[in-house]
Regions:
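Glycine-rich segments within core transmembrane alpha-helices of 12-TM secondary carriers
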Residues: 137-168
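Cytoplasmic membrane-interface "Motif A"-like loop-to-helix N-cap segments
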Residues: 78-90, 307-320
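Hydrophobic core of transmembrane alpha-helices in multi-pass small-molecule transporters
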Residues: 26, 96, 107-124, 251, ...
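Intracellular juxtamembrane helix-capping segments at the cytosolic ends
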Residues: 41, 115, 123-145, 264
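C-terminal ends and interior cores of transmembrane alpha-helices
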Residues: 91-105, 320-334
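Extracytoplasmic gate region of multi-pass secondary transporters
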Residues: 34-41, 144, 160-163, 233-304
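Central cavity-lining transmembrane alpha-helices of secondary-active solute carriers
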Residues: 57-75, 289-302
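C-terminal membrane-cytosol helix-exit motif in multi-pass small-molecule transporters
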Residues: 190-224
Length: 335
């Protein structure tokens, strides 16, 4: 009886952890909203005069920094704890965007602030909701991982629409410290990102030692079911062919999706205007929002599906479906 109480009694409702995870990921998804700024930054008659390749470099720097920092963040997490790591990530992300707003039309300033500093913040914060979530929900790992990272996709919808159209669009209406549109939005977003991550971090705590959800029994790794787990050290993992196969699947799938995220605004405007469509900017803005919405929905859906059919089959189906859709998209835009 005592053991049962120890396993099921928790200091907080575990669903609050999910809420906190979503708040954090809503902010970290800012990188996916970068495309909403590219048209303004590259407008020849505008304030900034960035080239398309310069905006691509800022976006790429953010993604690369995010990916690299995650490796180190995973190692830091057991040492400093989830709350401290999330707070550090949120403050760095917010600082990067605020400084990006203050550096103005400097490409190198944007590269450093939005790309490097902001990307570092995303990398530090991203690992926390996932790691904490699966500890609280060992019975629903796929679903909870999907929910935890869905905010990353949904967040882009919010930031894209706030900047571009909701309430007249912050890019058109905002002025902070007399700064022009893009810079003002960076400052507003930076403060907002930091506050949201700080709020979410308050519930980023690990469950008690030995915690198990009520009525759940850990699967037996020797049973051959997909829920079983085998632990590897980093060195052991790097010696397995499965690691390199899985890494290859992720990198090629991510490259395809991220290329779409970066160029959907500019490419969409060019393609629509080529076909004589006048309101191309509004249409591509809506397309960006729908892309982000289904990005979030897909994370939840595939996470839940993987709990039912297994991780291997789920990722195989995802990659195959993505390939078919990318080929269909190519056909749509060349006809």
């Amino acid at each position: 009886m005592e053991n049962s109480l120890k396993q099921t009694t928790t200091p907080i409702n575990r669903w609050l952890v999910v809420v906190g995870a979503i708040l954090i990921q809503l902010s970290l998804g800012a990188i996916y909203a970068w495309s909403v700024f590219t048209a303004r930054l590259t407008d020849p008659g505008g304030h900034y005069h960035f080239t398309a390749s310069e905006t691509a470099w800022v976006f790429s720097a953010g993604l690369a920094t995010f990916a690299i920092v995650m490796v180190f963040a995973g190692r830091l997490l057991p040492r400093v704890g989830p709350r401290a790591l999330a707070v550090a990530g949120g403050l760095l992300l917010g600082t990067g965007y605020v400084l990006g707003g203050l550096t103005g039309s400097s490409f190198w300033g944007q590269l450093l602030c939005i790309g490097i500093i902001g990307g570092t913040g995303i990398g530090l914060g991203y690992v926390v909701p996932i790691a904490v979530g699966v500890k609280w929900f060992p019975d629903k790992k796929g679903l909870i991982t999907g929910l935890a990272v869905a905010g990353f996709g949904f967040g882009a919808t919010i930031w894209v629409k706030l900047a571009g159209s909701w309430f007249g669009g912050l890019l058109n209406t905002s002025s902070v410290f007399g700064l022009p549109g893009v810079q003002s939005v960076f400052v507003i977003y930076g403060v907002t990102f930091a506050l949201l991550v700080l709020a979410g971090s308050t519930v980023m705590v690990n469950p008690p030692e030995g915690y198990r959800p009520a009525g759940w029994t850990p699967p037996d790794p020797s049973s051959g079911t997909h829920d079983g787990a085998v632990e590897f050290t980093t060195r052991e993992m790097l010696r397995t062919p499965q690691f390199y196969m899985l890494w290859s699947v992720f990198i090629f799938s991510a490259l395809a999706g991220l290329m779409v995220i970066y160029c959907i605004k500019l490419f969409g405007i060019d393609a629509l205007q080529h076909h004589g469509i006048v309101d191309a900017g509004a249409i591509t803005g809506t397309a960006m929002a729908w892309y982000a919405i289904f990005n979030g929905i897909g994370r939840i859906a595939w996470g839940s599906i993987s709990d039912r059919i297994g991780r291997k089959l789920a990722i195989t189906l995802m990659a195959a479906l993505q390939g078919v859709i990318m080929l269909m998209t190519y056909h749509v835009f060349i006809t």
